[in-house]
Structures are given as C-alpha cells and as structure tokens.
C-alpha cells in the first residue's frame, strides 16, 4: 500500500546522487588497487610471501566492493528509467522487485560509503510499507541479487583465488614467485569458473577493460600490449582465369521444383579493329578545300528544285570549280514612268507658293 512519507521527487534526486557517488568511489578504489599491486610485487621480490598474501586479501575485498557498487549503480539507473511505474502503481511491479529489494538490503551495509543510499531505502520502504523493508533486509523475500550478496559477504576469499592473484601480479611485474603447490593441488574443479567470473573476465583476456573497476588483470595475450594483429592478406584474382559464377554442387529441389545448374558465361572477345578505316564516298577529301564553309558541309542538302539550277561541278576536283556569271550592278537610276514629272524641281514652284502666302496674309 502507499506509504504516507513517500516523496517521489526526493527519491528521484537521491537516486541520481547515489549514481554519481558510486562512480566517484569506483574510480578512487580502482586507482588505489593499482598502487597496492605494485606494493605486493615489492613484497614478493623481497621474499615476504605471507605479507603479500594478506595484502592480496585487501585487494580482493576492494575488487568485490567495486563490483557490488557497479551492480547498485545499474539498479539505480533502472529505477530512474522506470520511475513512472513507481509513481503510478501502488503495488510493486514485478520487473522492479529485484532492484528495489537489493537496494534496501545493501543500504545498511554501504551507508558509511554512500549516505544517500539510506535515504533511497527509506523512501522505498515508505512507498511499499515497512514490513516489506524488513523482509528485504533479511532476504526473507528471496529477490535480493545473489551475486551482490556474495560480493558484500564477510567470508574470507578462497586460498586458490589469493594464489592466482599473486601469480598474475608477479607475471605483470616480472617478479619470480613460486605458488603454493598444496593450495594449487587442493583447488576444487569449480573454482576455476568462479575465478574467471571474479577477476579473469573475457574482456580482460582480450586486452580491454574488465567489468570490475580493479578486479581484473590486464595480462597481454597474443602479443605485447598496444599491438594490433595484422589481418591476413586477401587473395587476388588471377588475370588469366575468365570470370564465371561458381557452379552449384548439383540439382536440388526447393518446394518440389527441380533446380537446374547454372552455366558459366562464355568468353566474349571484342571485335578486331581494322588496320585501315573504311572510305566513304560522301566525305572523301572533305578537308582538301579550306574555302568551303562549314554550313555547306554539315547542313542539310539542297532541295531538288534548287539543286537542278546549280551549275554542274566536278565531283572529285574542287580546284576547277567555276562560279556562274552574275549580272552587273547598275550604276544609274531607272527612268521615270510615263505621265510623271522628270525632276523634283518641276513639281514644286516656289514663286507660286510665296505669292499665295502673301495673299493669305493680306486676307487676315
């Protein structure tokens, strides 16, 4: 049922604060773990194996804690992504049961590291009742993440895990170390898988960052760190082999229909180019005469009526071409027609015009 002290906005703000605080702690603890590995290598070089084993247990604890923080960060991000379900539904959604119960279970164990985690747990208990919170803290409800419970447990790490940490640290820092033969012989067969899950992840073996903040080893595999394997050269096609599609193995039936085989394309060669170009009667010696305009060469031929009037010319020799005689241009004006005046001076009488003009002036 809906709790009276639940405040959705306060839960949203503290979820974001928890995510930011967890990221900072993961980065800090990872850097400290890397420095501690160098200290353990110095212990091994000095022959202080027991001191090195104790320091390795501290590193394993820190690596477990970093992985647990990553799980809690994931669950907080999930609650923010589905925050609408928390606000709208009075009952707990089945897809959020593991996230909510795990955060409530981890709050009293990590509140010294992340104080905002306790506020988140209190808001979730106010939302889904205090009785539900009690069941989550004791894991009587059975939905708390098992891996997180293993990472935050108070049990000592297995001896085989400690030995493998020492082996990897000695290998990375080039320090001679002889592992305990009794511990290596008594290692159960199932521990190897747990070791790979804890520290030796697939990402670390490939040279990439491990899932944990500092739990994995970055031992180079397949070459020194930073080198990239060269790809195999691609086979080049032969120049003398003609192209053809690969033939199928044989006819097969698809939905009861027989399928035939594909035939390769025949080798098609281009036709041979003749040694001398062919001659054309209509364009022979077209460039012999430079006086012929391009319009006469390229343009369409004359009409039959016009071509009949043109003088004949030799077909093969343009040098003997003679233009037809044209009439000369007249240099005198044509004669006046009958009944018309011969000159412009005879048509106009200026004396008569002046006399008439004077008479008009007198009348006015």
Swiss-Prot record:
GO CC entries: centrosome; cytoplasmic vesicle; midbody; nuclear envelope
Chief localization: cytoplasm
UniProt protein name: IST1 homolog
Biased composition regions of type Low complexity, renumbered to the chain: 335-345
Gene: IST1
Gene3D superfamilies linked: Vacuolar protein sorting-associated protein Ist1
Family (UniProt): Belongs to the IST1 family.
Species name: Pongo abelii (Sumatran orangutan)
Keywords annotated in UniProt: Cell cycle, Cell division, Cytoplasm, Cytoplasmic vesicle, Cytoskeleton, Nucleus, Phosphoprotein
